[in-house]
Regions:
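Conserved H-loop
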Residues: 265, 296-306
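Walker B catalytic acidic pair
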Residues: 268-270
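Conserved hydrophobic alpha-helix in the ABC-type ATPase nucleotide-binding domain
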Residues: 281-286
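P-loop NTPase switch/coupling surface
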Residues: 1-174, 253-254, 292-295, 308-309, ...
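Conserved D-loop-proximal element of ABC-family nucleotide-binding domains
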Residues: 275-276
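Extended helical coiled-coil dimerization/tether regions that scaffold
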Residues: 91-98, 121-260
Length: 390
């Protein structure tokens, strides 16, 4: 299992235990506590591991002075979060990567590795719903640009697909390059739809497109990747020392370095602008996508107590699915959205302490004693205090 340890980076001051990156991982906490920072670092180190596995770059290139800061951290605008005593260690299936004293170092691992399709879904995604290109934005992060590229590919595949909220559908008019949201008695352009749709549609559309591209192996190689793949294939078949069986084996091993076999979906605040029941349906749609391939991972940063409570429902349903009638469970939650208790980790971040702590669980169910639920309880206390003044 992958994990990451972070010390003295941005808002994160201390974290003694590695953060385990499970099939479903949540980060909750106040604004400025470092939720997105942790998620972005996970995305960054997973990308480096993937590049090393594919031999897109050699380790010496990554070890050059300031490459990590100026190229990789700047992608997510994290370059100024580095400190003199920053320590980060990421352990994946293919490589262990350590940043300390201003340098990256690598250790190759001999474990099965599912080459991932990585996607970071930024919180600014709702801009995309009413802008056709990043040229229309004066300032855009590299992450948002890449998300827009995936969104552009994804919408080209759409004719009409169901959305997970409001019993609605998404339609695409290719001639006019316009997306529409359609219900029983309405059809509106996405650019004129509610803010909830403008936030949800890019997230759902790209997630659905990418998981299907991995399942169906339709995600194209880049021009550079294809050139490198073809060159190495030619070298394999031109090698006079290989038998035919060895050539086939080497070609299959090479293909594994280029064919993606998992989808890692890293989503900032998926609850944006959504009513609680829509948050639930949105979450269940992401869990369904996550469950479509065994090696998939879903990483979420959130302020929403509803999402934490709904994921608890998914875990409890997963715990009892062998003991209860599936039809009865299906009336409560889609079977496709169930989560095994061992596949979930929820971390709380404390901006005052700069800490990251794993949320306790009871019988695999996340504890109710978390920052988000505690704030709901606090409103009851405040109301009771006011009643005492009457």
């Amino acid at each position: 299992m992958s994990n990451i340890t972070i010390r003295n980076f941005g808002a994160i001051k201390k974290h003694s235990d590695p953060i385990e990156i499970k099939k479903v991982t949540f980060f909750i906490g106040n604004q400025g506590s470092g939720k997105s920072t942790v998620a972005k670092l996970i995305a960054t180190f997973m990308w480096i591991e993937k590049a090393l596995f594919k031999e897109s770059y050699n380790p010496q290139w990554f070890e050059k002075n300031n490459t990590f800061r100026d190229l990789f951290l700047s992608y997510h605008r994290l370059e100024n979060y580095l400190k003199e005593d920053t320590y980060i260690q990421y352990t994946g299936s293919a490589f262990s990567i350590t940043y300390t004293k201003g340098q990256l170092s690598f250790e190759k691992k001999e474990m099965a590795y599912a080459l991932p399709q990585l996607m970071y879904v930024p919180s600014e995604r709702n801009f995309i719903s009413y802008m056709k290109s990043m040229r229309e934005l004066k300032v855009a992060s590299a992450a948002l640009n890449d998300f827009l590229a995936a969104y552009t590919y994804a919408k080209e595949k759409v004719t009409e697909i169901p959305l997970p909220i409001n019993e609605s559908y998404l339609l695409y008019d290719k001639n006019r390059d316009i997306l529409y949201v359609k219900g029983d008695d309405y059809r509106v352009q996405l650019s004129e739809a509610s803010s909830g749709f403008q936030s949800l549609v890019p997230l759902f559309l790209v997630s659905d497109y990418l998981v299907n591209s991995v399942k169906n192996k339709t995600e194209p190689m880049s021009i550079e990747e294809r050139k490198r793949f073809e060159k190495q294939i030619k070298e394999i078949y031109a090698n006079p020392h290989f038998t035919e069986e060895q050539r086939r084996s080497a070609a299959n091993a090479l293909s594994e370095k280029f064919n993606k076999t998992s989808f890692v979906n890293i989503v900032e605040e998926p609850e944006q602008n959504l009513f609680p029941t829509s948050q639930r349906n949105m979450l269940y749609s992401l869990l369904k996508i996550n469950n479509e391939i065994p090696a998939n991972k879903l990483i979420i940063t959130t302020h929403s107590p509803y999402l934490v409570n709904y994921i608890s429902v998914a875990v409890e349903a997963g715990n009892i699915q062998n003991k209860a009638n599936k039809e009865q469970i299906r009336k409560i939650i889609p079977i496709s959205a169930l989560v095994k208790s061992d596949d979930l980790a929820i971390y709380q971040l404390n901006e005052k302490e700069g800490s990251v702590e794993l949320l306790d669980n009871y019988g695999g169910i996340p504890s109710d004693e978390n920052f988000l639920n505690n704030e709901i309880g606090r409103t009851n206390e405040l109301f009771a205090d006011l009643l005492d003044l009457q």
